[in-house]
Amino acid sequence: MQNDAGEFVDLYVPRKCSASNRIIGAKDHASIQMNVAEVDKVTGRFNGQFKTYAICGAIRRMGESDDSILRLAKADGIVSKNF
């Protein structure tokens, strides 16, 4: 819910899995959240920006988390398309 100023005022905003778009429940202790840093192409230094990926426990249990993270990173341009 938003107030008149457009700020979110909900007490709890659930996370969603980046790969499957499932809601990650509070009791899903196998889920992970990963921040991937963006670096400057010239200097190779961290520029203060990052991409956040959340993977639910069901994807990790199936052994598909590495493929899902690679697919998401390719879509965001972090990893080259021909990797």
UniProtKB/Swiss-Prot annotation:
GO molecular function: RNA binding; structural constituent of ribosome
InterPro entries: Ribosomal_eS21, Ribosomal_eS21_CS, Ribosomal_eS21_sf
GO cellular component terms given for this protein: cytoplasm; cytosol; cytosolic ribosome; cytosolic small ribosomal subunit; endoplasmic reticulum; nucleoplasm; rough endoplasmic reticulum; small ribosomal subunit
Assigned keywords, A-Z: Acetylation, Cytoplasm, Endoplasmic reticulum, Isopeptide bond, Ribonucleoprotein, Ribosomal protein, Ubl conjugation
Positions bearing N6-acetyllysine: 81
Function: Component of the small ribosomal subunit. The ribosome is a large ribonucleoprotein complex responsible for the synthesis of proteins in the cell.
Protein name from the UniProt record: Small ribosomal subunit protein eS21
